[in-house]
Swiss-Prot record:
This is Anterior gradient protein 2. It is found in: Secreted; Endoplasmic reticulum. GO terms for biological process: positive regulation of cell-substrate adhesion. The keyword Cell membrane does not apply. Keywords: Endoplasmic reticulum, Secreted, Signal. Residues 1-20 form the signal peptide. It comes from the Eukaryota. InterPro entries: AGR/TXD, Thioredoxin-like_sf. One of its GO terms (molecular function) is identical protein binding. SUPFAM superfamilies: Thioredoxin-like (SSF52833). GO terms for cellular component: endoplasmic reticulum; extracellular region.
C-alpha cells in the first residue's frame, strides 16, 4: 500500500510539473514608471518620493497629472516623449507622472483637470509663476505648446540657481 501511495504521489507531482510547463505564459506589457513619457529617464513612484528627492538632490520636480484615457493627455505624452530637447533637459529634474491628482491642495492651483504640468522647486514651493498659455487652465499644455513647456523647464532651472 505504501509503495502504491508513493508511486501515485510521484506520478501526481510529475503530471503537475508537466502540465504547468505546457500552460502558455500570459503576454503582459511591462509597465514602467515612465508610462511612455520618457522611457530612458528616471522617474519616481510617488509624490512624497518626488518631494524628498527634489529637496535632497537640489533639483526641481516636474509633476505631470494625466489620464490614460484622455486624448489630450495622450497627445501631450507623445509630444513630450518625442521632443529631444525636453528629454535631454528632463535629466536635470526629478520626474513624476501620476494618473490621478495628488491630495495636496497646493497642486490643484486653478482646478482639477488633465493634463497638468506643475513645477516644484527644491524648497518645496509650487512654481505658480511657470504657467502654460491658457487662462482658464493655466498649467495645461497641448502638443502645439511643447516649446513653451520646454522654455518653462529652462526657466525652472535658471530661477532655481538664482534663488538658492
Amino acid at each position: 500500500m505504501e509503495t502504491v501511495l508513493k508511486t501515485l504521489f510521484v506520478l501526481l507531482v510529475a503530471t503537475s510539473l508537466t502540465l504547468a510547463k505546457d500552460l502558455p505564459q500570459a503576454t503582459r506589457v511591462l509597465q514602467t514608471l515612465s508610462r511612455g513619457w520618457g522611457d530612458n529617464l528616471e522617474w519616481v513612484q510617488t509624490y512624497e518620493e518626488g518631494l524628498y528627492k527634489a529637496k535632497t538632490e537640489n533639483k526641481p520636480l516636474i509633476l505631470i497629472n494625466h489620464r490614460n484615457d484622455c486624448p489630450h493627455s495622450l497627445a501631450l505624452k507623445k509630444a513630450f516623449a518625442e521632443h529631444q530637447g525636453i528629454q535631454k533637459l528632463a535629466e536635470e529634474f526629478v520626474l513624476l507622472n501620476v494618473v490621478y491628482d495628488p491630495t495636496d491642495k497646493n497642486l490643484q492651483l486653478d482646478g482639477q483637470y488633465v493634463p497638468k504640468v506643475v513645477f516644484v522647486d527644491p524648497s518645496l514651493v509650487v512654481r505658480a509663476d511657470l504657467p502654460g498659455k491658457y487662462s482658464n487652465h493655466q498649467y495645461t499644455y497641448e502638443p502645439a505648446d511643447i516649446d513653451l513647456l520646454f522654455e518653462n523647464m529652462k526657466k525652472a532651472l535658471i530661477l532655481l540657481k538664482t534663488e538658492l
